[in-house]
Amino acid sequence: MGLEIKGVTIPALMIKLDKSRSFEENLEELEKKLSSAFFQGSVSVVDLSDMELSEDQKEKIESILKKYNSKVLGYRTSDKRSEKRSISNVSEKKSLKIINKTLRSGQRVEYDGDILIIGDVNPDAYVIASGNIIVMGTLRGIVHAGANGDETAVIMALKLKPQQLRIASYLTRSPDEMEEPEYPEKAYIEDNQIYIDKI
């Protein structure tokens, strides 16, 4: 069957290892597929429902993803209660919080980990996470990823139009007259400033 990489809920990717191959063979195929520009700069979920990996093996996967400007958002296992985020530069494992609704003005969500919002973030709504923030809708509110100082955190949205966007200690705002985004975008830190690119 071979190692698979496929879209889950945009903009994340699902990486499913081939249990019929050795871990080293999976790593080789993963790097080969990630070398395609299509997958670079993505956020990924690694499916471990068919096999178990040691912390050292997880770190090797994360190292390859980092090489191609990608990042592990979390690990999916057969036991959903054990799904944990395991990033090599984070000493404490953190989980993914899923919000299945639109956040309206005045609402506030804070979480020590990654936040996935299936809905919009309206103006004057606040989202604060120590990890990544992904919005499956339009982001018009105030967001702060990497709130504990994690400069590798990213913010992604199908339409990125925030009142205020912060990653770690870096801050930016949308222009007053900003055109409607035509594609999903991500915000990240590079060279001590926030960049916004299409996905």
UniProtKB/Swiss-Prot annotation:
This protein's record includes keyword Ribosomal protein: no
GO biological process, any: regulation of cell division
Parts forming coiled coils: none
Pfam families named in the record: MinC_C, MinC_N
Taxonomic superkingdom: Bacteria
Keywords: Cell cycle, Cell division, Septation
InterPro entries associated with the record: CAP/MinC_C (IPR016098), MinC (IPR013033), MinC_C_sf (IPR036145), MinC_N (IPR007874), Septum_form_inhib_MinC_C (IPR005526)
Entry's family note: Belongs to the MinC family.
Subunit structure as annotated in this protein's UniProt entry: Interacts with MinD and FtsZ.
Protein purpose: Cell division inhibitor that blocks the formation of polar Z ring septums. Rapidly oscillates between the poles of the cell to destabilize FtsZ filaments that have formed before they mature into polar Z rings. Prevents FtsZ polymerization.
HAMAP family noted in UniProt: MinC
NCBIfam families given in the database record: minC (TIGR01222)
Protein name: Probable septum site-determining protein MinC
